[in-house]
Amino acid sequence: MQLDWEIWLDTNISPAIAKWMNEETGITVKSSYSLSLHNLTDLDIYQRARAQGNVILLSKDADFPELVSRLGSPPKLISLRIGNCDNRTLWGFLRQHIQKAFEILTSTETDIVELS
């Protein structure tokens, strides 16, 4: 049985990105604010995502690749390495790459996809 995967956006990514992704990709995307994760540590977020099991974290944070590499998946991770940018620029970048990254993570044993 295939899980219905969700993408959880880290606190450093605007909830507006979640809204756009939900509307345009068909992927369930939730912001850290909608999940009440915005005041938690990275480890706490990792543990909550791990407990759910069908989560892909989307983050610019350098701590998440280390956590997933050290502790394993779930959760899986899309690690953004594009620097600071406004929401429109970030959405334009994600629009080009998110479907392929999602497909790789949900259909293979790959735990981390880095987008740069």
Language-model-detected regions and their locations in the chain:
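Intrinsically disordered, low-complexity and often Lys/Arg-enriched segments
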Residues: 1-5, 116
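Histidine- and aromatic-rich ligand-binding microenvironments
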Residues: 10, 36-50, 61, 82-98
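Short, hinge-like loop/turn segments at secondary-structure boundaries
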Residues: 47-49, 74-77
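C-terminal structural segments of small proteins and small subunits
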Residues: 75-115
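Conserved beta-strand termini and adjacent loop/short-helix elements that scaffold enzyme active sites
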Residues: 32-34, 60, 80, 115-116
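Acidic, metal-binding active-site segment of PIN/NYN-like and related structure-specific nucleases
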Residues: 49-50, 54-68
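N-terminal first-folded block
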Residues: 6-55
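Histidine/acidic-residue-rich catalytic or RNA/ligand-binding cores of hydrolases
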Residues: 69, 73
